[in-house]
Amino acid sequence: MVTTQPPEILGLLSDPLRWQLVVELGRSDRRVGELVQLVGKPQNLVSYHLAELRRTGIVSARRSSADGRDVYYRADLFRSRDLLGEAGHTLHPGLSLAPSPRDTVERRRARPRLLFLCTGNSARSQIAEALVEHRSAGTVEARSAGSHPKPLHPNAVRVMAERGIDISDRPTKSLTRFARNRFDRVITLCDKVREICPEFPGAPIAAHWSIADPAAAGDTDKATYPAFQHVADEIDSRVTLLLADLETRPLERTHRA
């Protein structure tokens, strides 16, 4: 009789605390102190399990650009999907992860409204807004703004043009412009903006994507362009997951300005 060990991912996520941590990080990037409050466990225990999750690559970490003493954790949901898919294949080659059912009636009834925020509204939030509009084919309404708007970065225009999306004529906007508007979700892409993000009417769902400023990666547009490509790829991956979430789960709130 041949015995086999179950795939590591199954043992890793069978722990209730690790599962809860991945679920929370799938919703928003978090600092360890926030995770401690959310799961109600001691920090040393949470840190231990985060280290185990990082070892397999389904959780990663980056130093906060707002405060270098802080670290933001994020879940790599595509990595989780791949590992779980491999586990299903190990059980039987005919098994695969089935897509979640789509509630098309609910999707047609409510058009989600999203607001993306960063410091300058010159790159990250603009990229996110454009990708949502493009990938949702207009079924999701997206807006973007910054705490201290500055001109659109030429590398943001270039990296989106390579994806067939023209953002060259988009204005940059201050977040105060949307202070009285209602959104279903408000997503910060900058650690600094997260610290000062105001409350919006109707208490929209808030999430944070801790993404480094690509313009800070070098002194010239040529030097920073690889960082812009990396950031655009990361935002595109997150937008793909966000749109899937909006498609498969009924909106908890439906707001209009």
Regions found by a protein language model. Name each.
Residues 1-5, 78-116:
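Amphipathic alpha-helical dimerization/coiled-coil segments
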Residues 4-45, 70-78:
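N-terminal helix-turn-helix DNA-binding core of bacterial DNA-binding proteins
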Residues 50-51:
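Short, hydrophobic-biased segments on the C-terminal half of alpha helices
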Residues 55-66:
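Beta-hairpin "wing" of winged helix-turn-helix
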Residues 102-176:
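Conserved active-site segments centered on acidic
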Residues 120-122, 191-194:
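Short glycine-rich anion-binding loops that position phosphate/pyrophosphate groups of nucleotides
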Residues 180-182:
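Alpha-helix C-terminal capping/helix-to-coil transition sites in glycosyltransferase folds
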Residues 197-257:
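Phosphate-binding/catalytic loops
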